[in-house]
Amino acid sequence: MRIEKSGFHAYNTYLEEPPRDAGNETALHRHVIIIGGDKYSFFAHWSGKFAHKGERISFTWDWDRTGEFRNIDKSSFEAFAKDGAVQIRGDRTDKRRPAGRR
């Protein structure tokens, strides 16, 4: 099933698995998005949000085996800025994070 250019009510992230000795990049986060009272979710190794307030989002989703959870296909997730440009964020982006200044 597909959600097309929809607004969202809430977007929250929760730490699902803590980081290992290798660092925070191995930590697994659950991303939960609420649209029209329905919860959609996916897992990512990035804790930052894939969409920001005021943006429209599109994604493909399917029920889990129990029929209880709506799982987002992370690779299909798109956020649209106000000008309509597609924003690719998270661990799918090809841009490097800015380096800290020392």
Each model region followed by its residue ranges:
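Structural detector for short beta-strands of small beta-barrel domains
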Residues: M1-A27, I88-G90
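Compositionally biased, intrinsically disordered low-complexity regions enriched in proline and serine
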Residues: H9-L15, R30-V32, S41, A81
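Short acidic/glycine-enriched loop/turn segments that link adjacent beta-strands
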Residues: N24-H29, T66-E68
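Intrinsically disordered, low-complexity regions
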Residues: M1, H9-A10, Y40, R65-K74
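OB-fold/S1-family single-stranded nucleic acid-binding modules
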Residues: T60-R101
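Beta-strand/loop nucleic-acid-binding surfaces
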Residues: A27-S58
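A structural detector for beta-sheet-dominated domains
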Residues: E4, Y11, G36, F43, ...
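Feature targets compositionally biased, intrinsically disordered low-complexity regions
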Residues: S6, A22, I35-G36, S47, ...
